[in-house]
Amino acid sequence: MKNEKIVVLYGGDSPEREVSLKSGKAVLDSLISQGYDAVGVDASGKELVAKLLELKPDKCFVALHGEDGENGRVSALLEMLEIKHTSSSMKSSVITMDKMISKEILMHHRMPTPMAKFLTDKLVAEDEISFPVAVKPSSGGSSIATFKVKSIQELKHAYEEASKYGEVMIEQWVTGKEITVAIVNDEVYSSVWIEPQNEFYDYESKYSGKSIYHSPSGLCEQKELEVRQLAKKAYDLLGCSGHARVDFIYDDRGNFYIMEINSSPGMTDNSLSPKSAAAEGVDFDSFVKRIIEQAQ
């Protein structure tokens, strides 16, 4: 309902602050242009509770990325204040923020996902790793401090960099096409195929504007149905709600591997969720409207 007061939460203090500011501005501009009573609130600092109590919004569009928006704290706060919001619940956000926990749940349910474990000083010192592997922070997004590692020397450097962001995981490297699917509750959108600027879809590839996106992805009808079903099952298994995105690798044998679930996807010009929706004929404004009107 357009007479509801909406707060767009963006910014914050995570390493993904700049991306979040861009997402928040795009969403806020869209809502205002559609006639919504919307204001933006930078979640940086310690005044968020006071701001929300002052504004008394009916709904919050969560455009925070990284720990600020995806570790469950904001969801818990909004639920405590009885404010409907566009992201997953506190419990689900905690799970999806931690890639290892998410992976363990998916593997328990026999969902296809690459093998992984925590990377430790002891493991780095061992010489029994089969390269290449992926090394990344267990928590975090935008592929910050994510590396394709091909040797023990590279492993040491990757571990040192990734450990700046918390616990580190080492994951089986899967070669193939990078595919993603956006979901808003029961609406599963078209898959998008990403041709990254670099060897894989790292931070630079995501935000340089030089990667190539195919939306729709060009999968055959059977494979498109399969990847959408896998995306929705993963979304449900991890208890997601609202707007989320599921990322895959599609290998040359026709297998999909779930890489991660993002509970607060980007909404910038280069972001994947709007491209997924656009492939279904849903433009950016309509997509924003669908997300906010389904806030829970």
Curated annotation (Swiss-Prot):
It is an enzyme of class 6 (ligase). Pfam families: Dala_Dala_lig_C. Keywords: ATP-binding, Cell shape, Cell wall biogenesis/degradation, Cytoplasm, Ligase, Magnesium, Manganese, Metal-binding, Nucleotide-binding, Peptidoglycan synthesis. The keyword Metal-binding applies. Mg(2+) 2 binds at E260, N262. Pathway: Cell wall biogenesis; peptidoglycan biosynthesis. Residues 103-293 form the ATP-grasp domain. One of its GO terms (biological process) is regulation of cell shape. One of its GO terms (cellular component) is cytoplasm. Its EC number is 6.3.2.4. It catalyses: 2 D-alanine + ATP = D-alanyl-D-alanine + ADP + phosphate + H(+). GO terms for molecular function: ATP binding; D-alanine-D-alanine ligase activity; metal ion binding. PROSITE patterns: ATP_GRASP, DALA_DALA_LIGASE_1, DALA_DALA_LIGASE_2. ATP binds at residues 129-180. It is found in: Cytoplasm. Mg(2+) 1 binds at D247, E260. Binds 2 magnesium or manganese ions per subunit. InterPro entries: ATP-grasp, ATP_grasp_subdomain_1, D-Ala_lig_Van_CS, D_ala_D_ala, Dala_Dala_lig_C, PreATP-grasp_dom_sf. Its cofactor is Mg(2+); Mn(2+). Gene3D superfamilies: 3.40.50.20, ATP-grasp fold, A domain (3.30.1490.20), ATP-grasp fold, B domain (3.30.470.20). Belongs to the D-alanine--D-alanine ligase family. Cell wall formation. This is D-alanine--D-alanine ligase. It comes from Francisella tularensis subsp. tularensis (strain SCHU S4 / Schu 4). The gene is ddl.
